[in-house]
């Protein structure tokens, strides 16, 4: 019996020690460093309106359906963050072809003056997560004519807005040149007021 206690005692102490270290100390240290070094990112990169209410995050896309605003990528989960993911069909899957054709038809209805051959692929295909907040600058630019027509904002103003909201690759290496749709639409909304 004494031998069992002598074996169990160090096991219990080690388990408790690692439980405290890995479950409490390490997360607190990492959270403290994140809050000190990159507070905005650690808090979810939230965007607030004039009333200091959270209206979104720069990291999660939103579904913009009003034709006066820029639209983001197609989302098979309708931008519901709790259901992140996508039907990642193989290029040979007929369902992918149907989904893309449906996206192109919707595009043509809203943007009849833009030839389908000029529509960037990111506007008619899903992302892996279904939550992409960004589109390519070209994807934003092909929407300028529609938005200009509906809002009476000059195309040049919209082009400059896109240019101002365009972000380069992170550290000059990671990712693509992109435009955050939520931030772009918030700036557009300021012009429309």
Swiss-Prot record:
Matching Pfam families: KdpC
Function as written in the Swiss-Prot or TrEMBL entry: Part of the high-affinity ATP-driven potassium transport (or Kdp) system, which catalyzes the hydrolysis of ATP coupled with the electrogenic transport of potassium into the cytoplasm. This subunit acts as a catalytic chaperone that increases the ATP-binding affinity of the ATP-hydrolyzing subunit KdpB by the formation of a transient KdpB/KdpC/ATP ternary complex.
Family in the record: Belongs to the KdpC family.
NCBIfam families: kdpC, PRK00315.1, PRK13997.1
Membrane topology reported for the UniProt record: Single-pass membrane protein
Localization in the cell: Cell membrane
Signal sequence range: none
GO molecular function annotation: ATP binding; P-type potassium transmembrane transporter activity
Keyword list, A-Z: ATP-binding, Cell membrane, Ion transport, Membrane, Nucleotide-binding, Potassium, Potassium transport, Transmembrane, Transmembrane helix, Transport
Complex formation: The system is composed of three essential subunits: KdpA, KdpB and KdpC.
GO cellular component: plasma membrane
Gene: kdpC
Protein's name in the database: Potassium-transporting ATPase KdpC subunit
Transmembrane stretches, start-end: 14-34
Keyword Transmembrane helix set for record: yes
Major localization class: membrane
């Amino acid at each position: 019996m004494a031998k069992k206690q002598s074996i169990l005692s160090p096991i219990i102490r080690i388990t408790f020690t690692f439980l405290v270290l890995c479950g409490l100390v390490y997360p607190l240290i990492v959270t403290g460093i994140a809050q000190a070094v990159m507070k905005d990112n650690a808090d979810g990169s939230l965007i607030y309106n004039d009333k200091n209410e959270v209206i979104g995050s720069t990291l999660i896309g939103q579904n913009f359906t009003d034709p006066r605003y820029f639209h983001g990528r197609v989302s098979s989960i309708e931008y519901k963050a709790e259901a992140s993911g996508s039907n990642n069909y193989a290029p040979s899957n007929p369902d992918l072809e149907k989904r893309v054709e449906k996206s192109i038809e919707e595009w043509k209805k809203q943007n009849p003056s833009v030839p389908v051959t000029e529509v960037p692929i990111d506007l008619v295909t899903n992302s892996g997560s279904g939550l992409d907040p960004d589109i390519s600058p070209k994807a934003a630019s092909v929407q300028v004519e529609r938005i200009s027509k509906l809002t009476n904002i000059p195309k040049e103003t919209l082009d400059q807005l896109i240019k101002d909201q365009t972000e380069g690759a992170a550290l000059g290496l990671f990712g693509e040149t992109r435009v955050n749709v939520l931030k772009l639409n918030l700036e557009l909304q300021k012009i429309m007021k």
